[in-house]
Swiss-Prot record:
Lineage: Bacteria, Bacillati, Cyanobacteriota, Cyanophyceae, Nostocales
Gene name linked to the record: moaA
Chain's role: Catalyzes the cyclization of GTP to (8S)-3',8-cyclo-7,8-dihydroguanosine 5'-triphosphate.
HAMAP family: MoaA_B
Required cofactor names: [4Fe-4S] cluster
Pathway the protein contributes to: Cofactor biosynthesis; molybdopterin biosynthesis
Sequence positions that bind GTP: R8, R60, T91, K155, R257, M258, R259
GO molecular function: 4 iron, 4 sulfur cluster binding; cyclic pyranopterin monophosphate synthase activity; GTP 3',8'-cyclase activity; GTP binding; metal ion binding; S-adenosyl-L-methionine binding
Identification of the protein by name: GTP 3',8-cyclase
Annotated EC: 4.1.99.22
Keywords, sorted A to Z: 4Fe-4S, GTP-binding, Iron, Iron-sulfur, Lyase, Metal-binding, Molybdenum cofactor biosynthesis, Nucleotide-binding, S-adenosyl-L-methionine
């Protein structure tokens, strides 16, 4: 079991997109009321006084869409300025990124993941549920802005949906050839989208790699990330290709992360709700910082057992919560 030192922090559960795999059409979404969200002060207290003292050093800001969080640049700056913060990154859909990319970089954000599920504007809008409002170009502008500012690595996340965007694998992989961009293919997962998943299923990373290997060849990359991706490279390419295979290749034994939801629930496992802690309620009811630390330490100690119990759930489980409610 890897050392667990990576915390994914959901800043908000709301999003300006409604992607099929994250917030499926027809599903009832009960958004968190503003007063139920962790405040900036509460979030920083938990990071600085609870998570860092028990060993967390890497933080990723997620959503929903994190750029919808008021004062997000200030929050980035506050976390980045903590001397114990070794790595601060963000996952965003990129729609609001272009105007504030430089501000985020100046505040201390250095790594960014941007969702790009298609290079075809029509298919892209279909996936994100734009209802006729074109969104692709503004996302692409956000990607270009992040590249100009100097985010490194700049990662592009692609959720592969059979019959929707799986024919674009080679075109998306080609983005890694001329720029130091890291394209990551993510297997479609049945979390909060059981009807869509049951209708379409998923494409394994092995199949995707074979397509790319047949076109260009494929080698193991010299650079390895801190997460679950298996990293490869097209020979001669500047960037890399990552494959996140939560459906076909269990990586629970490599898990190094926990998730903090926007309303303060600490979740040790994406697939298993065992042991989750309501830190916000505890904090607001006067539970001491020392007690909160000890609760998190205990959860860290039992996380391997929780992971083991959840390892087969990716292919057999049914989940009522959407990815946006979990925090991605």
């Amino acid at each position: 079991m890897n050392q667990v030192d990576y915390l994914r922090i959901s800043l908000i559960d709301r999003c300006n997109f409604r992607c099929q795999y994250c917030m499926p059409e027809g599903s009832e979404l009960n958004y968190i009321l503003k007063q139920q969200l962790l405040t900036d002060e509460e979030l920083l207290t938990l990071v600085q006084e609870v998570f860092i003292p028990v060993g967390f050093r890497q933080f990723r800001l997620t959503g929903g869409e994190p750029l919808l969080r008021p004062h997000v640049v200030d929050l980035v700056g506050a976390i980045a300025s903590l001397p114990q913060t070794q790595d601060l990154s963000m996952t965003t859909n990129g729609f609001l990124l272009a105007p504030i990319a430089q501000n985020l970089y100046d505040a201390g954000l250095r790594r960014i993941n941007i969702s790009l599920d298609s290079l075809d504007p029509h298919i892209f809008d279909q996936i994100i549920g734009s209802h006729g409002r074109p969104r692709w170009q503004q996302v692409w502008d956000g990607i270009q802005a992040a590249h100009r500012v100097g985010f490194d690595p700049l990662k592009l996340n692609v959720v592969v949906i059979p019959g929707v965007n799986d024919h674009e694998i080679l075109d998306l992989a080609a983005l890694s050839i001329d720029k130091q961009w890291h394209v990551r293919f993510i297997e479609f997962m049945p979390i909060g989208n059981g009807e869509l998943f049951g209708d379409r299923g998923w494409v394994s990373s092995a199949e995707l790699r074979q397509q790319i290997r047949d076109r260009w060849g494929l080698t193991d990359a010299q650079v390895r990330g801190a997460g679950p991706a298996d990293v490869f490279q097209i020979p001669g390419a500047k960037g890399t290709l990552g494959f996140i295979s939560q459906m076909s290749e269990c990586f629970c034994d490599r898990c190094n992360r926990m998730r903090l939801s926007a309303d303060g629930w600490l979740r040790p496992c994406l697939l298993n709700e065992t042991g989750q802690l309501d830190l916000k309620t505890s904090l607001r009811s006067g539970v001491s910082i020392h007690q909160l630390r000890e609760q998190v330490r205990h959860l860290l100690a039992i996380k391997p057992e929780i992971n083991y119990k959840g390892r087969d759930s990716g292919t057999t489980g049914v989940y009522s919560r959407t990815m946006s409610q979990i925090g991605g």
